[in-house]
Amino acid sequence: MEKAIRNFLSQESAGGILLLVAVALAMLMANSPLSGLYQGFLGTDVQVKIGELDIHKPLILWINDGLMAVFFLLIGLEVKRELLEGALSSVAQASLPTFAAIGGMLVPAGVYLLFNYGDPVTQAGWAIPAATDIAFALGIMALLGSRVPVSLKVFLLALAIIDDLGVIVIIALFYSTDLSTISLVIASLAIAGLVGLNRKGVTSLLPYGILGLILWVAVLKSGVHATLAGVIIAFCIPLRAKDGSSPSEGLEHSLHPWSTFFILPVFAFANAGVYVGNMNLETLISPVPVGIALGLMLGKPIGVMVFSYIAVKLKLAQLPDGIGWKQIAPVAAMCGIGFTMSMFIASLAFEHADPMYGDLARLGTLIGSIMAALVGYFWLSKVLPNKGV
């Protein structure tokens, strides 16, 4: 298990650097004479028409609805593996990261609502600071190399996976609108087919892919966010075949480099380009960016620490072996790295609002995530021993 985690983190570390490059490039283009080219590229109409099926969207929505569905497929595969065989497969293992994740979602949302309560438009962004970017958070931790105990890495990984599961539920419950009955019926039939394949022990990925594509189109047309199709597909792919092989893990390993080095950087490039030329101090301290930034910088670590402490004191959970509160605290700060996940929720929360709100949300996410990354990294670096453990 330790080798698998180290391989995972080494990939995430390189991916984290690529994410930073993508964000910097997006900000540069959005605030330079290339701004028109950048916006025009993302607004390029892309149409797919097969018979009566017609999907017509700008490029940025193909990225957010299509590529991110593949990312959520990967997240779903990771969640399923951890639930059945990994860090979440027993109550004892799952208790602490579960309580930590719940606190890390509730408190940031509460902080955001403190600044935005009463405004029906901005209130929609309450879930933005509740997210943790698993790739970026693990990438920052990986920069400290062998100084980080494996048990601490597993804690962050488990916490982030539960956080992702929470985000999936939030998207399904709060960011799905104008539901189409016909599309939902088709989606239900596709899900029934996927479950049937699983029950029959089918291990070939091709039929899952065909039904999965039908499911994605149906969910896209239904009003439920299309990324949820990826999670459903993942949960239906068998973890273990009769011969002991793992179709699920095989697909997970194949998707990881695509997610780390293509999907997430492309998403970051498409969504992080915030034009700041028309912003002033009053804009920067407006409720949306302040609520998000403080939710990530303060709400996340406070929520993670308080809920973890209560769970341990009530003997509902226990700290990982060899790990104390002084190591948990900087990891809690790292959970405030919302980055791509927070930006994704922002794109849903303010999809039909003035584009200014989306810009403010992305700006708050960038500020909060960068501060959380810096504080978490230097704090953890200070409390860890200088030599490998």
From Swiss-Prot:
<feature type="transmembrane region" description="Helical">
    <location>
        <begin position="177"/>
        <end position="197"/>
    </location>
</feature>
<keyword id="KW-0812">Transmembrane</keyword>
<dbReference type="GO" id="GO:0005886">
    <property type="term" value="C:plasma membrane"/>
</dbReference>
<feature type="transmembrane region" description="Helical">
    <location>
        <begin position="59"/>
        <end position="79"/>
    </location>
</feature>
<feature type="transmembrane region" description="Helical">
    <location>
        <begin position="363"/>
        <end position="383"/>
    </location>
</feature>
<comment type="function">
    <text>Na(+)/H(+) antiporter that extrudes sodium in exchange for external protons.</text>
</comment>
<keyword id="KW-1003">Cell membrane</keyword>
<feature type="transmembrane region" description="Helical">
    <location>
        <begin position="95"/>
        <end position="115"/>
    </location>
</feature>
<feature type="transmembrane region" description="Helical">
    <location>
        <begin position="292"/>
        <end position="312"/>
    </location>
</feature>
<dbReference type="GO" id="GO:0015385">
    <property type="term" value="F:sodium:proton antiporter activity"/>
</dbReference>
<keyword id="KW-0739">Sodium transport</keyword>
<feature type="transmembrane region" description="Helical">
    <location>
        <begin position="154"/>
        <end position="174"/>
    </location>
</feature>
<dbReference type="Pfam" id="PF06965">
    <property type="entry name" value="Na_H_antiport_1"/>
</dbReference>
<keyword id="KW-0050">Antiport</keyword>
<keyword id="KW-0997">Cell inner membrane</keyword>
<keyword id="KW-0406">Ion transport</keyword>
<dbReference type="GO" id="GO:0006885">
    <property type="term" value="P:regulation of pH"/>
</dbReference>
<keyword id="KW-0472">Membrane</keyword>
<keyword id="KW-1133">Transmembrane helix</keyword>
<keyword id="KW-0813">Transport</keyword>
<dbReference type="InterPro" id="IPR004670">
    <property type="entry name" value="NhaA"/>
</dbReference>
<feature type="transmembrane region" description="Helical">
    <location>
        <begin position="124"/>
        <end position="144"/>
    </location>
</feature>
<feature type="transmembrane region" description="Helical">
    <location>
        <begin position="213"/>
        <end position="233"/>
    </location>
</feature>
<keyword id="KW-0915">Sodium</keyword>
<comment type="similarity">
    <text>Belongs to the NhaA Na(+)/H(+) (TC 2.A.33) antiporter family.</text>
</comment>
<feature type="transmembrane region" description="Helical">
    <location>
        <begin position="328"/>
        <end position="348"/>
    </location>
</feature>
<feature type="transmembrane region" description="Helical">
    <location>
        <begin position="14"/>
        <end position="34"/>
    </location>
</feature>
<feature type="transmembrane region" description="Helical">
    <location>
        <begin position="257"/>
        <end position="277"/>
    </location>
</feature>
<dbReference type="InterPro" id="IPR023171">
    <property type="entry name" value="Na/H_antiporter_dom_sf"/>
</dbReference>
<protein>
    <recommendedName>
        <fullName>Na(+)/H(+) antiporter NhaA</fullName>
    </recommendedName>
</protein>
